[in-house]
Structures are given as structure tokens and as C-alpha cells.
Amino acid sequence: GRFDDEIVPVMIKVKKEMVPFAKDEYPKAGVTKEGIAKLRGAFPVSPESPNPQVVNTFEPTGIQEAADKGQPRVTAANASGINDGAAAIVLASGEAVEKYGLKPMAKLIGWGQGGVDPKIMGVGPVPASRQALKKAGLTIDDIDLVEANEAFAAQSIAVARELHFDMSKVNVNGGAIALGHPVGASGARIIVTLLHEMQKRPEAKRGLATLCIGGGMGVATIYEKC
């Protein structure tokens, strides 16, 4: 599969037998646009919402109809699933790379943190990414691949619009809505995925990894392939 290079199999016990667990269990087969459109919203629409604008990705769907009626728009289909997962990365100095004979996948060239009003916590990646780009002396046009964690579809679209992402470069193998969101591991997970995808694409020189954090925070890192 697409993620084989970045997945470490774990042996688990199924009944009386130990078997390798090496495939994500969250992605679901048989999902249709019609089924998605029938799902009920999860959260009430607040009259205090800073930006009640609705983004409709399917034509037609029940999502737009719900929006027109002031009904909830976030559903189980356009929100990330909470699942189990772990990820690991190694960050080393240039001296350590030379001393231990390491072969780095990429160099960290920019990073940033930002905070926004908790009511719009999902857009935290916007100030964080702008800060990281500034530190690296780059613009968004210099970025070849983006891994941006998806809390909800509306949240990720808001970030993409504010940062003017080229969507052909974003979450090219699926984001948290498709793959799931292992809380506490998503930051490392999207970096692992980003670096592996950069290795597969000769033209991909630089990548951006960013995600929102509860309470209004956002974090972003930029990598250059070695």
C-alpha cells in the first residue's frame, strides 16, 4: 500500500494467535456521497459563530440544505475520527548526524507557533505557517507538499483558503478525515507521512506540516529534502 514504507507492524493477539497488525483500521469501504448527505449534524449552529460561511463540497448534498435551515453542518463524515496510533521521528543536530553517520531524510528549515481566539481555534495553523514561512525566507509557492491535519472539513478548508494552498499539493494520500486522528500523535504522524512522500517525488524539495491545537493554538514546521 501507499503507506507501507512508514508503517511498523505490531504483533497483537487475536484469539490464541499472534498476528501482525500492519494496516490502518479506520478507512471505511463503501462510503458514498448519498450516504454522507443523510448524516445528521453533530453540533448546534451558534449565532455567535465568527464566520458562518458554509463550504459545500458535493452537489447536491444535504449539507447545504442543513446550512440554509440553520442546522448543524459538522457530521461524522466531514470530521476526523479519533483512533489509536503512534509515530516517532528523530531530530538531530548537524554535529550528531556527522558523529553517528546518520542519513537524514530532510532538514528542518522553519517553524512557527500561533494562537487565535478559541472560538476559531481551527485556524491556528494560519499564523503558525506564516511565521514558519517567514523564518525560512519562503512563500507558500515555494512549498511542494503540504500535510495539514484535518479536524473538520470546514476547518481545513478555512486554513487552505487563508494560506492560498494549491490543493493538488495538500494531503495527497488523504488527511485525518480519511485516515483518522490519533490524538497526541498527529503532529509526528503528518511529519512522517510528509517526509516519506517527499522521498517518493523527485520534484518535491520542500514540505510544510501544520496542525491546529485545542484552545486556539497552531504549529507549523517546514522541511527541505536532503
Which positions does each model-derived feature cover?
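Helix N-cap/coil-helix junction residues
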Residues: R2, L102, L138, F165, ...
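Cysteine-centered functional microenvironments
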Residues: P72-S80, G112, D144-A151, V170-S186, ...
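Conserved beta-strand-centric core segments of catalytic alpha/beta enzyme folds
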Residues: Q71, T75-A92, G187-C226
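Short glycine/threonine-rich loop-to-helix capping motif typified by GTGT followed
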Residues: M18-K23, P118-P125, E150-S168, P182-G187, ...
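Glycine- and Gly-Pro-enriched alpha-helical subdomains that act as flexible
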Residues: G94-D142, A160
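Predominant activation on well-ordered alpha-helical scaffold segments within soluble catalytic domains
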Residues: K33, A37-R40, A88-E95, V126-R130, ...
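Electropositive phosphate-/nucleotide-binding environments in soluble metabolic enzymes
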Residues: G1, G30-K33, A76, S80, ...
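N-terminal extracellular/periplasmic Venus flytrap/periplasmic-binding protein-like
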Residues: G1-G94, K99, E162, M167-K169
